[in-house]
Amino acid sequence: MIRVFNTLGRRKEVFNPYSPPLVGMYVCGPTVYDYTHIGHARTFTVFDAIKRYLRLRGYDVFHVQNITDIDDKIINRAREEGRDWREIVREYSRDYLEGLGSLGIQIDHHPRVTDHISDIIRFIEGLIEKGYAYVAESGSVYFEVDKYPGYGMLSGHLSKEAWRQEEDVLHEKKSPYDFALWKAAKPGEPSWESPWGRGRPGWHIECSVMSSRYLGSRIDIHGGGVDLVFPHHENERAQSESYFGHRWVRYWLHASYLTIKGEKMSKSLGNIIPLREALREWGPGPLRLWLLSSHYRSNLDYSEEALGQYRRLYERLRQAADSIGRRLERAEPKGRLGEGELETVERLKGVVRRWHEAMSDDFNMGKAMSSLWEFTTIYFREVEQTESYTLLWLSWRILTGFNSVYAFAPDIVEARRPERSLEDSLVQALVDVRSELRRRKMYDLADEIRSRLAQLGFVLHDKGEKTEWRRR
């Protein structure tokens, strides 16, 4: 049984999707007006891991994550830089998608706002027809907040003083708390034809339309950063439930902030770290492990010390993968396990059990991460020297199970599977030749083979008369 913390109600609930095993998950993606930073990456990696864990548990998850490619921020950036807004979108969309690819984040569909203008117009027309929206003299369209009685329940902002938005257009609203569904065109800004004149969508309507376009009128998980709870998700919920006439999202999940020395990243403080720089410094595997090292609802504080710790964990996991793959090639299944081996089996099973317990409890990734450390300790202390096929195969299954969720090394399942590849066979042949040269005391040639293999990324370890190797 999986339990998740639902922001709507602020309590843990048993995970029970609308139509199991199908799960529809929508995550609010970026507004592409600047480079993706590690705060964005934290949110996107968290929801990728949640999706992967649900798939591991047998759910068929369809993951939609939008790209907001028209917005005030994009228009302002284009104006500041004297560039066409579409150039801004292309540059920062590319940066975002490259960052996701490097982190192994797999999105099933990436809808863009500008590809759904007609869908947005139809949705707004429906809200007007149902009496939840009205057209102002300027041609802008607003959602009438007072018509939706549940407004404020998601965020807890039940006092109207917290709702005030868009001060510059107060004169044309029925209430200062109403928010824009469609913004009338301004000179020099991109716009599209609509029944109310030229204009462009408001921010909140975009996600309501794109999520329901691909996931239907009932969505299992709607996620994003905690900073989106109000007003963005509050407004999404209001307009969507008004349009559909029933509960829209079953579980609202929100990832907390990534901080630096306890402070939220911000341009004013000058402490933003672009994702591309973090990837260049730490590599995708260690970075991804670190991004998943705390509970997603808790802040994650950046420090080089912490990242160094997860780089070491990454290296241990890679070493374990190489070690298991090599040993499985020569290990032979045998009969009954010895008492010590049975005890190791139980310890490994305990690692998996505790990991599932943590992940099933609102995807407690911080607690679950301890199981990866524990696994490497047990493997190198108890399994590596046994040559036990059963223990090696169990270790392999555990490691690849972890990797299917954490995705710290996407190549492990394919390139490190227990079957020997041609490359592995050639390296092993050279290692065997070197061992024979050492036996004959032809150390110069043996050292030359070690040196050449090191240049190719293979590290040799001599243990008495035996030599083991791994990829660097």
From Swiss-Prot:
GO terms for molecular function: ATP binding; cysteine-tRNA ligase activity; zinc ion binding. A motif ('KMSKS' region) lies at residues 264-268. Keywords: Aminoacyl-tRNA synthetase, ATP-binding, Cytoplasm, Ligase, Metal-binding, Nucleotide-binding, Protein biosynthesis, Zinc. Its EC number is 6.1.1.16. One of its GO terms (biological process) is cysteinyl-tRNA aminoacylation. Its cofactor is Zn(2+). Zn(2+) binds at C28, C207, H232, E236. ATP binds at K267. Pfam families: CysS_C, tRNA-synt_1e. This is Cysteine--tRNA ligase. It comes from Aeropyrum pernix (strain ATCC 700893 / DSM 11879 / JCM 9820 / NBRC 100138 / K1). The gene is cysS.
